C-alpha cells in the first residue's frame, strides 16, 4: 500500500489544523520507511510556514540538521531519529498555532521557537486563558522561565527592559488564574505619581486622572480577551485596577495581585504592598530598574526588595534583558545600547 493511501485512510485531524499522521509513522516504521510527513491543509498557512523563498524552512533545517521537503501541502523529513521527528512536529505545530491565532510574522515565531530550550517543563509554558482571543507563547527562554516561576511560586519579582513582556505575561497568567476560577479576583496596581506629576493638579475627576496611568493594563487585557469581557469583569468587581495608595490597610485573599512599574515605589510602599498578601493569594511584581522616576536620593523599593528577599526560596526572582524585547526590532537595539552604557558605568 502506498504511503499516500495510508495517509488518506488513517490521518488524524490535529486541533491546530494539522493532520498529524501517527498511523503513517507506524506504517513507515514497520516498513522501514524513513519519511515523516506533516500535512498542512491550508495553503496560506503553509506559505507562511515556509516563508519568503523558503527562508523559514532553511532555519528549521539548520536547527534539525536534516533537509525539509515540500510536496503540495506536505512537509517532510527523511529520518528515523524519533527525537528529530518529535522536534519537527513540535516546531510546525507551534508555528501553525500562532498563525491560526493571528500572527503573521513567522520569522519572529520561528526565532522564538528555536531559541527556547526544549524541556518538558518549558512545553507547559503556553498560557491559555479561557475565552481568550489567542494562546500566549513565550518568545524567549527567559520568558518561558518567568512563566514557570509564576506557576511555581506565590510571589514573583520580574525586572527587565521595556517591551520584554514582564507586564503582559503577568497579566496573561493572572487572567488565566481568574477565568479558570483558581482565583476569585484580579487586582492590578501601580504607583501613579511619576515624572513629577501629582494627581491633585491634573484635570478631571479621579477616574479621568487615573486613566493615563492605568490604560496600559486595559491594552494588555484587550490583547488577550475581548474588550466586552474586560468591561464586564471590571464592572462585576472581578478585576480591580487601582493606584498603589488604595492597597493600604487591605488583606487580599484568594486573589492574584500585580504591581507594575514597581521601580517607582519607595521602600516603605513596597513593604506595604507585599504585606497585603492574604490566604491563597499570588503576587507578581514587575518593573524596570533603569527607568525609575524617583528623586535621586530615594531608594527604589524594587531594587531594595530584590536584594533583601533574594534568599527566600519561596519567592521567584526573574530578570529579562534586551534579548527578550518583543516590540519593534529597533527597540531591542535601543535597550541594548542603554544596557551597555549602564554596564560600563558600573
Predicted regions mapped to residue ranges:
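Intrinsically disordered, low-complexity linkers and terminal tails enriched in Pro/Gly
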Residues: 26-30, 110-126, 342-346
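N-terminal amphipathic/basic-hydrophobic helices that include classical n-h-c signal peptides
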Residues: 1-31
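Interdomain "pre-motor" coupling segment immediately N-terminal to P-loop NTPase/helicase cores
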Residues: 69-123
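Conserved helicase motor core of SF1/SF2 NTP-dependent helicases
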Residues: 133-259, 263-346
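Accessory, non-ATPase domains that flank or precede helicase/AAA+ motor cores in DNA-metabolism machines
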Residues: 24-90
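Conserved adenine-nucleotide phosphate-binding loops and their immediately adjacent elements
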Residues: 123-135
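Interdomain boundary/hinge elements
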Residues: 31-41, 95-110, 316, 320
Amino acid at each position: 500500500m502506498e504511503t499516500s493511501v495510508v495517509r488518506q485512510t488513517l490521518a488524524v485531524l490535529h486541533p491546530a489544523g494539522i493532520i498529524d499522521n501517527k498511523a503513517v509513522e507506524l506504517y513507515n516504521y514497520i516498513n522501514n520507511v524513513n519519511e515523516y510527513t506533516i500535512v498542512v491543509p491550508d495553503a496560506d498557512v503553509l506559505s507562511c510556514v515556509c516563508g519568503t523563498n523558503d527562508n523559514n524552512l532553511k532555519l528549521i533545517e539548520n536547527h534539525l540538521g536534516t533537509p525539509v521537503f515540500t510536496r503540495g501541502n506536505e512537509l517532510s523529513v527523511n529520518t528515523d531519529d524519533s527525537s528529530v521527528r518529535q522536534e519537527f512536529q513540535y516546531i510546525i505545530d507551534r508555528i501553525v498555532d500562532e498563525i491560526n491565532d493571528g500572527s503573521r510574522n513567522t520569522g519572529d515565531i520561528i526565532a522564538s521557537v528555536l531559541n527556547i530550550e526544549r524541556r518538558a517543563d518549558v512545553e507547559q509554558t503556553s498560557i491559555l486563558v479561557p475565552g481568550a482571543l489567542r494562546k500566549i507563547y513565550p518568545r524567549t527562554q527567559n520568558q518561558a522561565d518567568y512563566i514557570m516561576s509564576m506557576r511555581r511560586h506565590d510571589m514573583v519579582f520580574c525586572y527587565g527592559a521595556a517591551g520584554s513582556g514582564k507586564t503582559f505575561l503577568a497579566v496573561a497568567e493572572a487572567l488565566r488564574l481568574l477565568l479558570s476560577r483558581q482565583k476569585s479576583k484580579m487586582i492590578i496596581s501601580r504607583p501613579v505619581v511619576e515624572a513629577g506629576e501629582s494627581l491633585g493638579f491634573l484635570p478631571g475627576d479621579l477616574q479621568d486622572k487615573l486613566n493615563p496611568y492605568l490604560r496600559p493594563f486595559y491594552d494588555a487585557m484587550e490583547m488577550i480577551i475581548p474588550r466586552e469581557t474586560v468591561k464586564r469583569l471590571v464592572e462585576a468587581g472581578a478585576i480591580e485596577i487601582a493606584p498603589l495608595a488604595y492597597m493600604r490597610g487591605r488583606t487580599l485573599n484568594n486573589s492574584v495581585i500585580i504591581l507594575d512599574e514597581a521601580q517607582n515605589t519607595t521602600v516603605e510602599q513596597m513593604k506595604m504592598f507585599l504585606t497585603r498578601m492574604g490566604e491563597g493569594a499570588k503576587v507578581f511584581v514587575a518593573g524596570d530598574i533603569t527607568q525609575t522616576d524617583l528623586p535621586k536620593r530615594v531608594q527604589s523599593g524594587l531594587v531594595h526588595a530584590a536584594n533583601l528577599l533574594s534568599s527566600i526560596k519561596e519567592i521567584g526572582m526573574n530578570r529579562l534583558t534586551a534579548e527578550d524585547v518583543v516590540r519593534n526590532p529597533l527597540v531591542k537595539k535601543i535597550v541594548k545600547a542603554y544596557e551597555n552604557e549602564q554596564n560600563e558605568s558600573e
